[in-house]
């Protein structure tokens, strides 16, 4: 293996892990019937003239398995936060208690559970595509290096390394999807 031509597999791995992290974030936003502070992370509230994440205008807590509470720090933003939650598409009806917004998480019916597993599968497929795109970029780097004088043995080595990394990341996507689907279908 020649020292002068090397493929940056660390960069490829970092980009693939970024796709995996994005998948974890998308999975966290799925409402599975269990309360979690990450459910409300994507909700933006029109606060002080600009969209602000709800967790930056109040404290998000999970006091019970089926309850999320948000203690809004500024009384003037309680109504806007409640409106943002209603319009978020979470399907949760917020209840007000002073500056505290309570979000009771209802049980999911079978149809909704199946729908959420399909959504989770779509998220996983997007992550797989992103990982394959990174793989393609790596293979393109190898082709450029081959035209710059990389030996055929080195080319095979780097192609194998990139493919091995891709297979490992795709397997972790599949594993995360299995775990998420099991969590969603659990009654």
From Swiss-Prot:
Domain of life of the native organism: Bacteria
GO cellular component: cytosol
Coiled coil stretches, renumbered: none
Origin organism lineage: Bacteria, Pseudomonadati, Pseudomonadota, Alphaproteobacteria, Rhodobacterales
Pfam families documented for this protein: RRF (PF01765)
Primary location recorded for the protein, binned into one broad class: cytoplasm
Native organism: Paracoccus denitrificans (strain Pd 1222)
Role this protein plays: Responsible for the release of ribosomes from messenger RNA at the termination of protein biosynthesis. May increase the efficiency of translation by recycling ribosomes from one round of translation to another.
InterPro entries: Ribosome_recyc_fac, Ribosome_recyc_fac_dom, RRF_sf
Subcellular localization: Cytoplasm
Keyword list, A-Z: Cytoplasm, Protein biosynthesis
One GO process term, biological-process aspect: cytoplasmic translational termination
Protein name per UniProt: Ribosome-recycling factor
GO molecular function: ribosomal large subunit binding
Family (UniProt): Belongs to the RRF family.
